[in-house]
Amino acid sequence: LYPTILANAGTMKNKGLEIRLSAIPVQTKNFQWVTTFNYSTNSNEVVSLSNNQFRVERGYFYAGYLGNTIKQDTHIVKEGEQMGNFYGFKSIDVDENGKWIIQGKDGNPKPIDQQQQEDKMVLGNGLPKHFLSWDNTFTFKNFDLNLTMRGAFKYQILNTPRLYYEVPVSLAHGNLMATAYDPVFGKRPLNDHQELQYVSYY
């Protein structure tokens, strides 16, 4: 028996804007160039995670489990906040022994070994706020060529290869990245005994 059940009970609100501009800069008997610019932006909010039939114990749940090595979630889905929020410890420094210093819930620095669940915070968001694309179609007689460039802006990513393989302690399990012993924050490398930690540095 399982203590929980998955249900499609949530409500989310989305709003955004999309702008599309097209032009034909060149058009002759045998040649045509059509160009199109497209811009879009979107924002969202988790309105509710419950309904009349199903209800979560709290107004949030965690997602994005990193696996047995780290045993931490990467995201939080919370009522009143955006989807895609990274949630974890904010790393602000390394101490003289090469161990993480994080920002505590009171805003003050504290050693990673003294971490508490309450010290976790929203570290960023993995959903792009802006999209921009530029599409060009060139037609010459019966031949055509299409070139498209697309960009996504104002979002964060989690670099999991660095999280796992840029930490000296991982040498006990295999190869490391060449940057594993580079100074962190320009100060010193991580300690050989600093455990894998999901922090904002990555």
Please identify what each model-predicted range represents.
Residues 27-29, 45:
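Secondary-structure transition/hinge residues
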